[in-house]
Amino acid sequence: MKATAAILAVMVSSQTFIPVLAADSVDASAIDPVPGAYGYYVDVYTNNSSSNTTQEINPSIGVLSGFLKLWTPGTEWNNGTILDEAILNENIDKAAEITNTRTQKEEDRAYLDDRRNQNYSMISGLGVYAENFIKGANAGTTISDTIPADATTVKYEDGGNSNGVWADETSSLGSIVKFVNTVRNSSASTSSAKAFFKYMRPFRWSEDVSIVSTLIPCKSSDPSNDGGFPSGHTNAAYLAALSLAYAVPERYQEMLTRASELGNNRIVAGMHSPLDVIGGRIMATAVMASMLNDPTNAELKKAAYEQAQNVLLTQTGTSTDQYSDYKTNLKNYTYRLTYGFEQTGDITKAMVVPKGAEALLETRLPYLDATQRRWVLYSTGLPSGYPVLDDAEGWGRLNLFAAANGYGAFDNDVTVTMDASQGGYHALDYWKNDISGSGALTKKGTGTLILSGNNTYTGGTVLEEGSLKAASGTAFGQGDVINSSGTIMEDASEGLTIDGDYTQMEEGTLELNIGSEEDVVNITGQASFDGTLVINFINDYVPANDTEIISFSSLDAGTEFSEVEIHGLPEEYKAQINGEALVVSTEATANDTAEDSDSTDTAESTDETEAGATESPATRDSSGAVFYFAMLAFGITGVVVYNRKSRKNA
């Protein structure tokens, strides 16, 4: 066994396999919350008010106190002290570069994101459901896509819908609207933090930062009441986006991307710097978690989620999805977490998971418990050392986009139970991260979990029920794979490596989707076969004779698949063990042909197999001999079925 966290197998009988998992676990205290100077944000979030002006009392100031390593606020808007000239100069230089290279299209988007209610702006993150939401919520804006010609001299305000609001709480989607409003309007303002830090907007730091011409009328004439850090628009966008993401977790990452885009548009507009935008995101994340943890919001958040699932998502989406490109979303969101600043602080700090942060994932990863969600946040957090991000509680280092992709590491053994009858992510989910760590994965329940990362976890993999799909060649990391009762599916064009032993019990199924000669399952250790093998040939691929489908270093003597099915090939193809591989071929031995003839001439043989089947010869041992599986032909495409159980019981 290669697994660092060994899989210890106990064979109770030929059909019973009890795995005992032992991982070199990270101590459970690793995910314990650490308070800030103000306590825990989720406990004291209502202390964010204009009357509380210190970081020890006001959490909106305290959570951003990392900025004090770069800047000391002055007594006035323009007399603060720069502590880290390199970083603050870089901050303004980045803003200048973005404003000086923006396109007209980017300017127009920046204008719309400035002038529209941020709640309305976030609707586009719903993708194909955006228009359905606008109609169902009676959402509206008076800021049209066509920017008025006189916008360079006239400041336009968003008048909302016909009722003067962005959407109606009395509409068919009113619970969602009310949820967003509640989050936005509860101790969520950036005003206290702006007043405390007194850090100027970028255009006041440098003339190289240019404001979009249509937003010049929006420039405040009173710099003493117009701080840049943190960005209020960004804060509002993330609050609205996270609210919608909670209700519609199917759009979780797209909503995050949309919020990050609005934040970036604040830089494009010339109104904010990258650090301003980062600060807005950090604060909004803490506020959102606080609202989700507040028991007074329990019924409201439930109602919003249920309304989204039962009303909005049951409709056919008609809108164009502007955020359908996952790779682009990932690239943009990840960059905007740090805006390319280098790690100039302590890079050795362990990840800290804020108290209550797990609530941010409770609809996105509903099949995990609260503790497991904290481990997900722990394993997907940003490294330490980036400017502003290292707050005591850990809000700045959360990467919710990555967390929505499941674990980033198995720091201890992980057991996942998915009940497909509950639908949604309970029935099917993708874990796209590259999973490391010494822990093992055990999959239980009837749902399907898909692993698609370049995984290196070493604890091994156990499937007890349901389905586990490998969508990458290294999906199962390093270690033994055990299929006791479920379906392991291979769907990786480059083939699948099982870096250890593979053991399949009688109730297990291995299903392969083979689309090329390279699409092979390579078992580096010993194979022990039982149960069912299903081979689907796809993409019109027809293999040559003796093409390897499964390779292994050795085969457990006396083991074989009870049943084999081949789909997608002409009926003359058969599966066979040839040395240290299972291959497919149209060739048959003389012994095979003779025994085939005998099997169709006697009533006894017919009784032993399904009607119309042709039985293959008995196998020899796996030391290099060849054994053939019988074939049932269904039309043009063959289905090879070898039922070992019926022959043994004859």
Task: Give a label for each model feature.
Residues 589-617:
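Ser/Thr/Gly/Pro-rich low-complexity, disordered linker/stalk segments of secreted
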Residues 635-650:
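C-terminal membrane-anchoring or membrane-association module
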Residues 441, 470-546:
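Extracellular beta-strand/loop-rich repeat segments of large surface/secreted proteins
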Residues 233-237, 268-297:
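Alpha-helical transmembrane segments that form the membrane-embedded catalytic/substrate-binding core
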Residues 12, 24-268, 341, 345-406:
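Hydrophobic alpha-helical bundle signature of multipass membrane enzymes
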Residues 14-25, 614-624, 643-646:
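Sec-dependent signal peptide cleavage junction
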Residues 295-363, 367, 385-438, 535-595, ...:
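Extracellular/surface-exposed low-complexity segments
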Residues 408-477:
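Extracellular repeat-rich scaffold modules on cell surfaces
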